[in-house]
Swiss-Prot record:
Coiled coil stretches, renumbered: 163-184
Keyword Cell cycle recorded: yes
Cross-referenced InterPro entries: E2F-DP_heterodim, E2F_WHTH_DNA-bd_dom, TF_DP_C_sf, Transc_factor_DP_C, Transcrpt_fac_DP, WH-like_DNA-bd_sf, WH_DNA-bd_sf
Entry's localization field: Cytoplasm; Nucleus
Organism: Arabidopsis thaliana (Mouse-ear cress)
Organism placement in taxonomy: Eukaryota, Viridiplantae, Streptophyta, Embryophyta, Tracheophyta
Induction trigger: Up-regulated by the transcription factor ERF114.
A Pfam short name: DP
Comp. bias intervals (Low complexity): 252-280
SUPFAM superfamilies, sorted: E2F-DP heterodimerization region (SSF144074), Winged helix' DNA-binding domain (SSF46785)
Chain positions of motif DEF box: 101-135
Protein name per the record: Transcription factor-like protein DPA
Binding partners and assembly: Heterodimer with E2F. Interacts preferentially with E2FA and E2FB, but also with E2FC.
Disordered: region residues: 1-25, 246-280
């Protein structure tokens, strides 16, 4: 048999003929499924009965599919109908006929198959249904996902730190360029200077350092004779210069603000003395103002 189910499908874009108007109302079409069943032959609007429900049928269908691996809709539905017939015979209480009739069972099986297909648990080729397997979500998978996430987060943090370092380096270079331009304008600039990049070695002023340089100037051997030392690149030095400049600007700004505050207070006090009719120099003594 063939199964027909009525669906409302909104029409897709159609080529419009100049003399024909296309209606935008939903078009009723019929979905025909070759499964030799009578699912959907019941009247529209008939409610499904409660009871085991789709979940119960889904478990049974899943067990059948997993056991058979390759099967058909008709084979699965027939076996489940047979199983329910056996249950009905052995049941102490009579079962709901509407819930466990053949048409209702086939409809439930069909709904379960559609759900499994949407979840990629099964694959369907015409009438043949092939079992693909349930999604695997175990503790091991969760731990692997967490490890991958930690690796990604660590990589992001390293890249963020590297980006911050690059920004600081660019800012330091821009500050150095501005400083050099000002020096050239004011003092014509120094006769000699350092070129970038460079390396700075820091050690004790009294340390004895033995230096050997190859003839091609490509290899340098340094022996500090067990004296502690540090190696700094140009980026580190530029960063220190930038921090020093910012500190100087901060101190200068703070000093200027403090000076302006004192000048404003003195001017206010002097005006107060004139307004009161007194004259003479203003003297500061432990925060008090005296006039003579």
């Amino acid at each position: 048999m063939s199964m027909e189910m009525e669906l409302f499908v909104t029409p897709e874009k159609q080529r419009q003929h100049p003399s024909v108007s296309v209606e935008k109302t939903p078009v009723r079409r019929k979905l025909i499924v070759d499964d030799d069943s009578e699912i959907g032959s019941e009247k529209k609007g008939q409610s499904r009965t409660s009871g085991g429900g789709l979940r119960q049928f889904s478990v049974m269908v899943c067990q059948k599919l997993e056991a058979k691996k390759i099967t058909t809709y008709k084979e699965v539905a027939d076996e489940i109908i047979s199983d329910f017939a056996t249950i009905k015979q052995n049941a102490e209480k009579p079962l709901n006929e509407n819930e466990y009739n053949e048409k209702n069972i086939r409809r439930r099986v069909y709904d379960a198959l559609n759900v499994f297909m949407a979840l990629d648990i099964i694959a369907r080729d015409k009438k043949e249904i092939r079992w693909k397997g349930l999604p695997i979500t175990c503790k091991k998978d969760v731990e692997e996902v967490k490890m991958d996430r930690n690796k990604v987060m660590s990589s992001v943090q390293k890249k963020a730190a590297f980006l911050k370092e690059l920004r600081e380096k660019v800012s330091s270079l821009e500050s150095l360029m501005s400083r050099n331009q000002e020096m050239v304008v004011k003092t014509q600039g120094p006769a000699e200077g350092f070129t970038l990049p460079f390396i700075l070695l820091e050690t004790n002023p009294h340390a004895v350092v033995e230096i050997e340089i190859s003839e091609d100037m490509q290899l340098v051997h340094l022996d500090f004779n067990s004296t502690p030392f540090s190696v700094h690149d140009d980026a580190y030095i530029l960063k220190l210069m930038q921090e020093q400049k910012q500190e100087q600007n901060r101190v200068s700004s703070s000093s200027s603000t403090h000076h302006q505050s004192q000048h404003s207070s003195a001017h206010s006090s002097s005006s107060s003395c004139i307004a009161s009719g007194t004259s003479g120099p203003v003297c500061w003594n432990s925060g008090s103002i005296d006039t003579r």
